[in-house]
């Protein structure tokens, strides 16, 4: 089998499609020379045979076979007939997956305007035509005529709007025996708009606008600049203004608007099929009316209905009454499928699930370092499975991948020590949606934890705008060495202390951290349990607190031989001196008691503090290692 070469491209550009381009999307020449692509019938499938109707919205001749390597009539089956076009049904024998990308088209009996360009904000049709949006709508929806050529009539101007009565009056004057009026042309509907757009010489209009901009100011200048910008964009993209009206409508592949049979024999179908059916029905009816030379008022009404059907297909509800289906539910148009949070871009393209990633609720991990995160064992073994398998084979515990997977599935105790080894020094990235700035995704060193929640250091919460009331975070594993290096050097949490927006520290204790520090170090005169007791050292005092002999805020005395004691206020003033009779002296300060020898050396020093302050000081000292 020949390897397919990947098409290389530099960028994707979105531009207005010409009618020829739309026709090219859907039109194909079969190997036998038959040209197919135009959808002419509104039928979907035959409800007796359950096969797609020919030339309908699910036609196998246009879009490809419903079953792999099988034509519509069943004459050709199996892959050996690849590429053959059936003489009976005209279906090319190929894979059914072509129905996911082969398009069709509908040739319209009359042009229609594209609702995005008419009713969008701003309305590009009204900007290009230099007319009010209300006036353009009047023309498009057959409520007013527009003068396409004033001829020799002095009372008419180019692009002037006329009501039905005014046009009837002018017609009477034109067809009068003594009339001298010549060359007057008026139009209505999208055909008139298409002609007005086609008559625009974009380069000439752009030059004229540049001259006018130089001579004008204020609101008029802003309006001219807006029009020039639109025209310049048309020129730059080699697009023509009349392409904003449609002569041909693309029909998207049938597998993207499926029809499936339910248990009760009923069918569930995509809303697009109903919208396409409306367009085809009205288009066929209009073509038939034009053939039989029906009265102009009937043809005009059918053209308006066709315009409304195409509007509903492209963007249902943008203009006029919303088309509804069963249970008065608005039908989902092409725009509804593309736009919004559940649309194709945000949901399916940007919101794809990626390999080597997981998601779980976050809980606080107070014992973690700032650059660490607690990763549940269950999640870690899944994320790091390839690395664990490689390590198991390298250590000779298993011989192949299958045996390694079996060992992991069984939950063998050996795998946990291997997992510990694998994750050491391998950072993971944590991301919390919405990622509004670069600190919304940071790297951490994983620590294996029990349970099913990711543990996060409380100090990194402001960067993620996270809290622990049920927030979820995603974990991603950088696979290549380059990615791991970048994660460690650039994205590690301890390297992201400053806010990129303000340059101020974003890592700052808040809420319960500040409250905890305050509570530990606060003074409470009412705490009398064990107050005034003496302890030989810090450990003794903490042991007494653990056994409930002293309160957290009780004032106690601790022997502390280090001279360097920091107090809230300078404590250098001796309040009282007591001679102990053995040549030593006891000096009493506000928060200290010092026993000095004959030569003034410190024998013993007691300082007044609380168990809470001891805990705080000890924790800080251990963290800073001084």
From Swiss-Prot:
Tree of life domain: Bacteria
Cellular component aspect of the GO annotation: DNA-directed RNA polymerase complex
GO biological process, one term: DNA-templated transcription
Reaction equation(s) it catalyzes: RNA(n) + a ribonucleoside 5'-triphosphate = RNA(n+1) + diphosphate
Top-tier EC class: transferase
Similarity comment: Belongs to the RNA polymerase beta' chain family. RpoC1 subfamily.
Function comment: DNA-dependent RNA polymerase catalyzes the transcription of DNA into RNA using the four ribonucleoside triphosphates as substrates.
Quaternary context: In cyanobacteria the RNAP catalytic core is composed of 2 alpha, 1 beta, 1 beta', 1 gamma and 1 omega subunit. When a sigma factor is associated with the core the holoenzyme is formed, which can initiate transcription.
HAMAP family noted in UniProt: RNApol_bact_RpoC1
Name used for this protein in its record: DNA-directed RNA polymerase subunit gamma
Organism whose genome encodes this protein: Synechocystis sp. (strain ATCC 27184 / PCC 6803 / Kazusa)
């Amino acid at each position: 089998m020949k390897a397919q070469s990947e098409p290389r491209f530099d960028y994707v550009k979105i531009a207005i499609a010409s009618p020829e381009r739309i026709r090219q999307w859907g039109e194909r020449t079969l190997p036998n020379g038959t040209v197919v692509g135009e959808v002419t019938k509104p039928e979907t499938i035959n409800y007796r045979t359950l096969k797609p109707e020919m030339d309908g919205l699910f036609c196998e001749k246009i879009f490809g076979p419903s079953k792999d390597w099988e034509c519509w009539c069943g004459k050709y089956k199996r892959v050996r007939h690849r590429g053959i076009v059936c003489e009976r049904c005209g279906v090319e024998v190929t894979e059914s997956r072509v129905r996911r990308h082969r398009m069709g088209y509908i040739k319209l009996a009359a042009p229609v305007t594209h609702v995005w360009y008419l009713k969008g904000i701003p309305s590009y049709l009204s900007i290009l035509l230099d007319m009010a949006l209300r006036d353009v709508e009047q023309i498009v929806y057959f409520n007013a005529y527009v003068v396409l050529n004033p001829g020799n009539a002095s009372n008419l101007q180019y692009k002037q709007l006329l009501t039905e009565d005014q046009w009837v009056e002018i017609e009477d004057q034109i067809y009068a025996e003594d009339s001298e009026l010549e060359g007057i042309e008026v139009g209505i509907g999208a055909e008139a708009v298409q002609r007005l757009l086609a008559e625009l010489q974009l380069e000439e209009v752009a030059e004229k606008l540049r001259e006018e901009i130089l001579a004008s100011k204020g609101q008029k200048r802003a309006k001219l600049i807006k029009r020039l910008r639109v025209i310049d964009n048309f020129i730059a993209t080699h697009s023509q203004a009349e392409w904003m009206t449609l002569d041909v409508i693309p029909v998207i592949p049938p597998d993207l608007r499926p029809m499936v049979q339910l248990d009760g024999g009923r069918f569930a179908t995509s809303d697009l099929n109903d919208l396409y059916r409306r367009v085809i029905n009205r288009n066929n009816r209009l073509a038939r009316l034009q053939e039989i030379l029906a009265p102009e008022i009937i043809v005009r009404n059918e053209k308006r209905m066709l315009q409304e059907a195409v509007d509903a297909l492209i963007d249902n509800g943008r203009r006029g009454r919303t088309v509804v289906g069963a249970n008065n539910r608005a039908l989902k148009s092409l725009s509804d499928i593309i736009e919004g949070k559940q649309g194709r871009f945000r949901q399916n393209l940007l919101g794809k699930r990626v390999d080597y990633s997981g998601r779980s609720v976050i809980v606080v991990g107070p014992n973690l370092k700032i650059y660490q995160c607690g990763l549940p064992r269950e999640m870690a073994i899944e994320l790091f499975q390839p690395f664990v398998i490689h390590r198991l084979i390298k250590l000779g515990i298993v011989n192949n991948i299958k045996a390694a997977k079996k060992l992991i599935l069984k939950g063998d105790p050996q795998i946990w020590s291997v997992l510990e080894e694998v994750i050491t020094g391998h950072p993971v990235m944590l991301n919390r949606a919405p990622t509004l700035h670069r600190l919304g995704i940071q790297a951490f060193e994983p620590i294996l934890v029990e349970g099913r929640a990711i543990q996060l250091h409380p100090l990194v919460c402001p960067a993620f705008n996270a809290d622990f009331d049920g927030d979820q975070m995603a974990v991603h594993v950088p696979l290549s060495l380059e990615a791991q290096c970048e994660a460690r050097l650039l994205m590690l949490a301890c390297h992201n202390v400053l806010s990129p927006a303000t340059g101020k520290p974003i890592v700052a204790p808040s809420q319960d951290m500040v409250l905890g520090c305050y509570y530990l170090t606060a003074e409470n005169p009412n705490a009398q349990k064990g107050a005034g007791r003496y302890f030989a050292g810090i450990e003794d005092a903490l042991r007494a607190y653990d056994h409930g002999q002293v309160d957290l805020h009780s004032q106690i005395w601790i022997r502390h031989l280090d001279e360097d004691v920091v107090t809230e206020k300078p404590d250098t003033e001796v309040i009282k001196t007591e001679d102990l009779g053995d040549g030593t002296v006891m000096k009493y300060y506000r928060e200290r008691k010092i026993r000095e020898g004959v030569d003034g050396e410190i024998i013993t020093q007691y300082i007044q503090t609380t168990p809470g302050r001891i805990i705080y000081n000890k924790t800080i000292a251990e963290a800073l290692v001084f």
